[in-house]
């Protein structure tokens, strides 16, 4: 997919599709299906997208640094907690995937909790999150977090205004407690424009491989865009504390979004290179008395390819 079309909006769509090639599959997509929608949404506002070669070169460099960070976290028994928040379709999942892609899942893990159960709803609000906080030598990334109360729960009416106010009073001290306990806490908000969210939702509607990402809550969030904006602004004003400030990542270009977030994350943690002992691969030992057993054919996966 390297040709140039006469329609700039389709060039942008092609770049979006190529972005998925690094995920080990290609998406068959009907470009005419969305071309009119893209023209209508963007007109002359097509975003300036980062070149793919520049993107991958820098992504690999940053992922190598993330491995160094992982080694440092494990070696120093540090605790890192990264909160990822933002509008629906803002690219949080893509950023998280690029952060964890080459890391050890036993050290760097992702937490994405479902809606609270009836029992959890009766608990102290932060209680369901506490078991997932990092222990020594761990990095934890929250794909949405306790800030659901300030966002979706508030806008959709799942929490009362009294509960929201209690949250705003509690969360600064809760996060100060985490920092005092030795946790390195980073909070990111991923920001996209109204038009960009509309386009990404349309791609989810028309792309069978992305339809699972589209929920009734996503559709409702389009209707309540301004309510979410107001809730976000109050969340920033009430929870942006010196011990745990917010960092906003612009996300209209997903490639820049990923690189900028990872670059910033690395700059906020004082990690160092950890020396490793040289590894020498031992020779295989052969036992002259060993005979390999012949296994029945039904144990093998058929060679279709």
From Swiss-Prot:
The lineage of its organism: Bacteria, Pseudomonadati, Pseudomonadota, Alphaproteobacteria, Rhodobacterales. Pfam families: PPK2. The keyword Transferase applies. The keyword Kinase applies. PANTHER family: ADP-POLYPHOSPHATE PHOSPHOTRANSFERASE, POLYPHOSPHATE:AMP PHOSPHOTRANSFERASE-RELATED. Shows little dependence on metals. Keywords: Kinase, Transferase. Its EC number is 2.7.4.-. InterPro entries: P-loop_NTPase (IPR027417), Polyphosphate_phosphotransfera (IPR016898), PPK2-related (IPR022488), PPK2_PA0141 (IPR022486). It comes from Ruegeria pomeroyi (strain ATCC 700808 / DSM 15171 / DSS-3) (Silicibacter pomeroyi). This is NDP-polyphosphate phosphotransferase 1. SUPFAM superfamilies: P-loop containing nucleoside triphosphate hydrolases. GO terms for molecular function: polyphosphate kinase activity. Uses inorganic polyphosphate (polyP) as a donor to convert NDP to NTP. PolyP hydrolysis is slightly faster with GDP, but it can also use ADP, CDP and UDP. Has two pH optima at 8 and 10. GO terms for biological process: phosphorus metabolic process. It catalyses: [phosphate](n) + ATP = [phosphate](n+1) + ADP; [phosphate](n) + CTP = [phosphate](n+1) + CDP; [phosphate](n) + GTP = [phosphate](n+1) + GDP; [phosphate](n) + UTP = [phosphate](n+1) + UDP. Belongs to the polyphosphate kinase 2 (PPK2) family. Class I subfamily.
């Amino acid at each position: 997919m390297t040709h140039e079309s006469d329609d700039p909006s389709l060039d942008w769509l092609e770049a979006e599709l190529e972005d998925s090639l690094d995920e080990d599959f290609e998406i068959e997509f009907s470009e005419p299906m969305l071309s009119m929608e893209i023209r209508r949404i963007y007109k002359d506002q097509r975003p300036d997208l980062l070149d793919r070669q520049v993107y991958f070169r820098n992504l690999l460099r940053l992922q190598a640094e993330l491995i160094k960070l992982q080694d440092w976290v494990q070696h120093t028994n540090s605790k890192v907690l990264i909160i990822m928040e933002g509008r629906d379709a803002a690219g949080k999942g893509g950023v998280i995937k690029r952060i964890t892609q080459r890391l050890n899942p036993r050290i760097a893990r992702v937490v994405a909790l479902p809606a609270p159960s009836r029992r959890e709803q009766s608990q102290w609000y932060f209680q369901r999150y506490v078991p997932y906080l990092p222990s020594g030598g761990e990095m934890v990334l929250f794909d949405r977090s306790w800030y659901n109360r300030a966002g979706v729960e508030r806008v959709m009416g799942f929490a009362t205004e009294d509960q929201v106010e209690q949250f705003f009073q509690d969360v600064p001290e809760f996060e100060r407690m985490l920092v005092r306990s030795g946790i390195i806490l980073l909070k990111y908000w991923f920001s996209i424009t109204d038009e960009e969210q509309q386009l990404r939702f349309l791609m989810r509607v028309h792309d069978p491989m992305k339809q699972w990402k589209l929920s009734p809550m996503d559709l409702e969030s389009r209707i309540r865009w301004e309510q979410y904006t107001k809730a976000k602004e109050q969340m920033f004003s009430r929870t942006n504390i010196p011990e745990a400030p917010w960092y906003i990542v612009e996300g209209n270009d997903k490639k820049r979004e990923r690189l900028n977030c990872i670059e910033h994350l690395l700059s906020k943690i004082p990690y160092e290179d950890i020396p490793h002992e040289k590894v020498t691969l031992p020779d295989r030992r052969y036992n002259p008395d060993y005979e390999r057993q012949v296994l029945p054919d039904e144990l093998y996966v058929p060679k279709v390819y």
